Amino acid sequence: MLLLFLLFEGLCCPGENTAAPQALQSYHLAAEEQLSFRMLQTSSFANHSWAHSEGSGWLGDLQTHGWDTVLGTIRFLKPWSHGNFSKQELKNLQSLFQLYFHSFIQIVQASAGQFQLEYPFEIQILAGCRMNAPQIFLNMAYQGSDFLSFQGISWEPSPGAGIRAQNICKVLNRYLDIKEILQSLLGHTCPRFLAGLMEAGESELKRKVKPEAWLSCGPSPGPGRLQLVCHVSGFYPKPVWVMWMRGEQEQRGTQRGDVLPNADETWYLRATLDVAAGEAAGLSCRVKHSSLGGHDLIIHWGGYSIFLILICLTVIVTLVILVVVDSRLKKQSSNKNILSPHTPSPVFLMGANTQDTKNSRHQFCLAQVSWIKNRVLKKWKTRLNQLW
């Protein structure tokens, strides 16, 4: 524990540059949610001799840091992920986490029998701080369920976690040095690091990307019923409001899925509504997002059918053109295939050769037209399937 305190002395008391940047006093978040910095740890224990831990750091919903389990080093995922910390401060922080991950696995494996932790099991820890808020947070989950938390001055078992969580909290509450370390790390170092990140990444945090939305039919929930699906994608920041509407009336049956990340660091969400087939008319999907400047995005159910009609008309026109071209080629070929009934002459022989050449050319054209038709049909069929 002495080593932890020495590391923290350098981390929490670096001398100069300990105040949060003044420029942040006027900083306003693009999202409605209060911004936080969160550290997430996932440790898997297969047996008493094998365990694996992963760690990551998140500024709001944006991952800014990772933990290299092989090298035991912090991975900075953004050019500004260093914040305003000095190299020495980051080195101290990295040394602290190296010691923590190594010690955590040893302590858990040594205590698994005492607290009846049955292999294999998984422990998740979420800890961090919020900007301009005094409270800190640390929550632990065991096998995917809430287990215990650190409330700033004491460890508390989660409701329904049972006697095992109560016993572990009793043991943890005896170690005052652990409480002091957490209070310093989460109550002092974390807010200062969060302030530096917000200043360094201000331009990216203020980025706004407008959502795109489209409608489709999902799997039928039953005879005579429809599942209407509203897809919203490509928006940033994450907070978004999506609802099926009838006029100005919200449809309470709207089911929202999870907000999922896209590869370009934007977000995707779908909202569904099960209705009787005859009640779909007049419904619309409304999207509210900070990038829209107060103007809601509204898509009416059935509006997309006009688009489908245009596609169908385009397909029909294309097929008609192909049929006309095919017909003309056949007509030209038949006009030039009239043979003379007289004895063959050199001119006829020459014409025969020409005819063979033209027949070959005609067959090639027919094959090409057939290939074009098949290809076009295949493409349009694929597009239509995607819409449905």
From Swiss-Prot:
Coiled-coil intervals, chain numbering: none
**Which residues, renumbered to this chain, are glycosylated?**
47, 84
For this chain, one GO molecular function annotation is: lipopeptide binding
Q: Kindly list the GO CC terms recorded for this protein.
A: early endosome; external side of plasma membrane; extracellular space; Golgi apparatus; Golgi membrane; late endosome; lysosomal lumen; nucleolus
The consequence of residue 106 to R is: In allele CD1E*02, allele CD1E*05 and CD1E*06
Altering residue 164 to W: what's the impact? In allele CD1E*03
Question: Signal peptide position in this chain?
Answer: 1-19
Q: Can you give the residue ranges of the Ig-like domain?
A: 191-301
Name the Pfam families for this protein. Answer: C1-set, MHC_I_3
Q: Where are the transmembrane segments?
A: 305-325
UniProt keywords, alphabetically = Adaptive immunity, Disulfide bond, Endosome, Glycoprotein, Golgi apparatus, Immunity, Immunoglobulin domain, Lipid-binding, Lysosome, Membrane, Signal, Transmembrane, Transmembrane helix, Ubl conjugation
The protein's assembly and partners:
Heterodimer with B2M (beta-2-microglobulin). The association with B2M appears to be facilitated by the presence of the propeptide.
This chain belongs to the protein called: T-cell surface glycoprotein CD1e, membrane-associated
Q: Which organism is it from?
A: Homo sapiens
Gene name per UniProt: CD1E
